[in-house]
């Protein structure tokens, strides 16, 4: 069994990597991937904590997080596809400019 601290440190590293990608990247597809990494890091923390205290609650929360991530990914990719068809780019700086 992995010690609690090692699992939580790994989850924190993954979360920080996802947050860094979310803040630095200007491409919406990479931002969506970074958000998925952050969701998986939080789910990993739930599983590690549940395993440490020998409770199945962490695994239940993991299933909920994966369901949330799947719904977020499907809606996000559908929106990205429509935006790319209209603007021919996924750069957030060009998409956020106002027309008028």
UniProtKB/Swiss-Prot annotation:
In which domain of life is the source organism classified? Bacteria
Assembly, in brief, is: NDH-1 is composed of 13 different subunits. Subunits NuoA, H, J, K, L, M, N constitute the membrane sector of the complex.
Name the enzyme group at the top EC level: translocase
Entry's Gene Ontology cellular component terms: NADH dehydrogenase complex; plasma membrane
Q: Which InterPro entries does this entry report, sorted A to Z?
A: NADH_UbQ_OxRdtase_chain4L/K, NUOK/Mnh_C1-like
Q: So what EC number does this one have?
A: 7.1.1.-
Positions of disulphide bridges: none
> Pfam families this protein is in?
Oxidored_q2 (PF00420)
UniProt-listed NCBIfam families: PRK05715.1-1 (NF004319), PRK05715.1-2 (NF004320)
Which membrane topology term applies here?
Multi-pass membrane protein
Compartments, record wording: Cell inner membrane
Tell me the protein family, please. Belongs to the complex I subunit 4L family.
* HAMAP family per the UniProt record, alphabetical: NDH1_NuoK
Q: Does the keyword NADP apply?
A: no
| Gene3D superfamilies membership | 1.10.287.3510
Q: Which reaction does it catalyse?
A: a quinone + NADH + 5 H(+)(in) = a quinol + NAD(+) + 4 H(+)(out)
- What is the protein's name according to its record? NADH-quinone oxidoreductase subunit K
GO MF entries: NADH:ubiquinone reductase (non-electrogenic) activity; quinone binding
Q: What does this gene product do?
A: NDH-1 shuttles electrons from NADH, via FMN and iron-sulfur (Fe-S) centers, to quinones in the respiratory chain. The immediate electron acceptor for the enzyme in this species is believed to be ubiquinone. Couples the redox reaction to proton translocation (for every two electrons transferred, four hydrogen ions are translocated across the cytoplasmic membrane), and thus conserves the redox energy in a proton gradient.
| Natural source organism | Pectobacterium atrosepticum (strain SCRI 1043 / ATCC BAA-672) (Erwinia carotovora subsp. atroseptica)
Keyword field: Cell inner membrane, Cell membrane, Membrane, NAD, Quinone, Translocase, Transmembrane, Transmembrane helix, Transport, Ubiquinone
Q: Which GO terms describe its biological process?
A: ATP synthesis coupled electron transport
Indicate the principal place this protein occupies in or around the cell: membrane
Q: Where are the transmembrane segments?
A: 4-24, 28-48, 60-80
Keyword Cell membrane attached: yes
């Amino acid at each position: 069994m992995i010690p609690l601290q090692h699992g939580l440190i790994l989850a924190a590293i993954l979360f920080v990597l996802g947050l860094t990608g979310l803040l630095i990247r200007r491409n919406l597809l990479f931002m969506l991937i970074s958000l998925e990494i952050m969701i998986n890091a939080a789910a990993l923390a739930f599983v590690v904590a549940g395993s440490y205290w020998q409770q199945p609650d962490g695994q239940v929360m993991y299933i909920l997080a994966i369901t949330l991530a799947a719904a977020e990914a499907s809606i996000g990719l559908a929106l990205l596809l429509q935006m790319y068809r209209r603007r021919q780019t996924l750069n957030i700086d060009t998409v956020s400019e106002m027309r008028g």
